[in-house]
Amino acid sequence: AGDHCKAASDLGLPFVAVGLMYHQGYFTQIIDEHAEQRVEFHPHRLDDLPITPAIGGDGRQVEIELAFPGRSVRVRVWQAMVGHLNLYLLDTDVPGNRDDDRAITYQLYGGDRTTRLTQEIVLGIGGVRVLRALGVAPSVWHINEGHAAFLVLERCREQVAHGRSFAAALEQVAAATLFTTHTPVPVSYTH
């Protein structure tokens, strides 16, 4: 998605992006003495990254809560600049969260199906709620790959809560949503 951000910045488009704050970043692939692939993650120190707390209207770092079965997960938000545009990064490594919930945003492509699904809920539903908390009201929403698809359901939920039928909400949300994929092969599909 970085290329979308860079291009939008270069073109001067009014654009904001939301992603996950992966504390261990991308992995390094190592081939060991048995010609087997090993994956090594290298934790980031937040102080070393070009990010700052995303500050809300109350002057404090934006933090939201997401309901999961039997628990609530706190998500705090960081801000990075990509050219002239804001990139908001969602982070579950928050004191008070369970250890497994703190790890939701540790690794890109890490974990099992449950971890991936949980990351997608944080990104999709959490992303909408974060933009609302920041006072950002996009006229068009773009989903790059299926990882943020839960934003469609969250936006429909908002409209139904305001009295629209689900069918009307879905129609309006669909009309203001774009989807792109950079890996159009079955192996890349999220199920």
Regions found by a protein language model. Give the residues of each.
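A conserved hydrophobic secondary-structure block that centers on an alpha-helix together
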Residues: 1-11, 17-18, 110-139, 143
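Conserved small/polar residues in nucleotide/adenosyl-binding loops
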Residues: 190-191
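Generic recognition of stable, solvent-exposed alpha-helical segments in well-folded globular domains
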Residues: 3, 85, 118-126, 143-154, ...
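Active-site proximal beta-strand in glycosyltransferases
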Residues: 90, 160-183
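Active-site cores of enzymes that catalyze phosphoryl transfer or operate on phosphate-rich substrates
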Residues: 58-129, 180
